[in-house]
């Protein structure tokens, strides 16, 4: 660039250039971002930017100074040196990345403007979009170049801020700021980019105050009137059409030399404006941090409320769960207690029942022991006191005559003694009787035989059954009489067993039955009688099942003192035997089962007959 030049020219380029013309007052931030209007088109030659015109004129001055340096005055030299210094700084900063294609100020401002309008969501897409926007306004740059240039301007901006903070009260601040005065417009654009969200009116008011201060300082000098007129002219030119923009820019170029004479005053105004901007930035940062803290506090309170509500719900659910568990456990315990009580009651009942059974068993055992002891004593008496056959025959004849008298006297009293009772018919198939042929009465009975095989399988006719009942009753009455009169027949009655005497009585009447058969028949009769007597039901007189029921009832219900009822029953039975058919006769069957013990009460003063396992127990 300086090939063929003089060393003095290099010295002049190194010298500090005058500051650029100040920004017009009350200029909005959106209008300060670019030196051309929004409707700018890079292909329209009639709308040439103001800054480009001034830059071209400066280049022309610089070119003229390059060839005719001996004809230029101090003001022109100063202007040429400022232009040269601007190009020199740009060439130093952009030498590495933009050696062949340097960035002009308009291009940098357009880059900052487009970059400030794009959100930094996707970096690569952002720089591609910025590159396309630059291409639309006539600047062809790649996304990588745009990114590198923006980062470079960003570093310069931060370096400028650091220098201003460190040298606020130092006189060197004016010189440092003058060295960066050529990039003032770019500095303001970068600052606008980093503080894009702030209020534009507040910034414009601060800038207006700074311009007022600067105007007051300029009025203290010699050329204050001219400067104010130029500033007012610039304000008017900004509102005019695009055709008048070129004339205003030329006037600014002519007046820039006069403005340079008051450079020191302008530097003071710029330093004060920059310090005020820094204070505004700090205040806005503080407010921003305060707002962020408030938002964070609101978010924190909201999250804490959610957590508290969730914890309260969890505690309530846990409490309900515990209550349900306690309730279930109490119900379970109550059920177990009720079950235990029921089991205890059941066990107690079983114990009571067992105690009763044991008492009954003990009573039964006691009765059996008494019977066995009495029976053994009875057998011993029979063995020790045998009687002669003559005595037996005489006693039997006497008793036979007494029985006949009783039978004759009681025949007239039979209708009065028989009364209806509550009876229940029993199936004859439950305990069938063994069949036997009916034998006529033997007027001349033969002596009984000792073997029992002769009467096996023979039926018991009804008259024979009635005879057995009457004989059993008569022997019981005779035993009572023997107890009253011990001197009469007590010795003979005790000498022979009960069923042996009954068998002999049956043989005298004409029925040949052994003592064992008589005993078995008597047990069967009592068994059927007990079954029918336990049921409280009326029983007809002509019932086929257990036809001797009424006789047994009358037998057990009559008083023991008299014998008229027995004879009457015998006479009635004899008459019934002649009138009833043959099929009504009841037989007997040998029972092989064990019959439980039963005590037959014949009335007050009568002996009890105990039947147990085929034995006739009397006590």
UniProtKB/Swiss-Prot annotation:
<feature type="compositionally biased region" description="Basic and acidic residues">
    <location>
        <begin position="448"/>
        <end position="458"/>
    </location>
</feature>
<keyword id="KW-0175">Coiled coil</keyword>
<feature type="region of interest" description="Disordered">
    <location>
        <begin position="434"/>
        <end position="458"/>
    </location>
</feature>
<feature type="compositionally biased region" description="Basic and acidic residues">
    <location>
        <begin position="575"/>
        <end position="585"/>
    </location>
</feature>
<feature type="coiled-coil region">
    <location>
        <begin position="307"/>
        <end position="361"/>
    </location>
</feature>
<dbReference type="GO" id="GO:0005516">
    <property type="term" value="F:calmodulin binding"/>
</dbReference>
<feature type="region of interest" description="Disordered">
    <location>
        <begin position="62"/>
        <end position="100"/>
    </location>
</feature>
<keyword id="KW-0238">DNA-binding</keyword>
<keyword id="KW-0677">Repeat</keyword>
<dbReference type="GO" id="GO:0006355">
    <property type="term" value="P:regulation of DNA-templated transcription"/>
</dbReference>
<feature type="compositionally biased region" description="Polar residues">
    <location>
        <begin position="384"/>
        <end position="396"/>
    </location>
</feature>
<comment type="function">
    <text>Probable transcription factor that binds specific DNA sequence.</text>
</comment>
<dbReference type="GO" id="GO:0000987">
    <property type="term" value="F:cis-regulatory region sequence-specific DNA binding"/>
</dbReference>
<keyword id="KW-0804">Transcription</keyword>
<keyword id="KW-0539">Nucleus</keyword>
<feature type="short sequence motif" description="Nuclear localization signal">
    <location>
        <begin position="503"/>
        <end position="510"/>
    </location>
</feature>
<keyword id="KW-0805">Transcription regulation</keyword>
<feature type="domain" description="Myb-like 2">
    <location>
        <begin position="459"/>
        <end position="526"/>
    </location>
</feature>
<dbReference type="InterPro" id="IPR044822">
    <property type="entry name" value="Myb_DNA-bind_4"/>
</dbReference>
<feature type="compositionally biased region" description="Pro residues">
    <location>
        <begin position="16"/>
        <end position="27"/>
    </location>
</feature>
<feature type="compositionally biased region" description="Low complexity">
    <location>
        <begin position="435"/>
        <end position="444"/>
    </location>
</feature>
<dbReference type="GO" id="GO:0005634">
    <property type="term" value="C:nucleus"/>
</dbReference>
<feature type="region of interest" description="Disordered">
    <location>
        <begin position="382"/>
        <end position="414"/>
    </location>
</feature>
<feature type="region of interest" description="Disordered">
    <location>
        <begin position="11"/>
        <end position="41"/>
    </location>
</feature>
<protein>
    <recommendedName>
        <fullName>Trihelix transcription factor GTL2</fullName>
    </recommendedName>
</protein>
<dbReference type="Pfam" id="PF13837">
    <property type="entry name" value="Myb_DNA-bind_4"/>
</dbReference>
<feature type="region of interest" description="Disordered">
    <location>
        <begin position="557"/>
        <end position="619"/>
    </location>
</feature>
<dbReference type="GO" id="GO:0003700">
    <property type="term" value="F:DNA-binding transcription factor activity"/>
</dbReference>
<dbReference type="GO" id="GO:0045893">
    <property type="term" value="P:positive regulation of DNA-templated transcription"/>
</dbReference>
<feature type="domain" description="Myb-like 1">
    <location>
        <begin position="102"/>
        <end position="154"/>
    </location>
</feature>
<dbReference type="InterPro" id="IPR001005">
    <property type="entry name" value="SANT/Myb"/>
</dbReference>
<feature type="compositionally biased region" description="Low complexity">
    <location>
        <begin position="561"/>
        <end position="574"/>
    </location>
</feature>
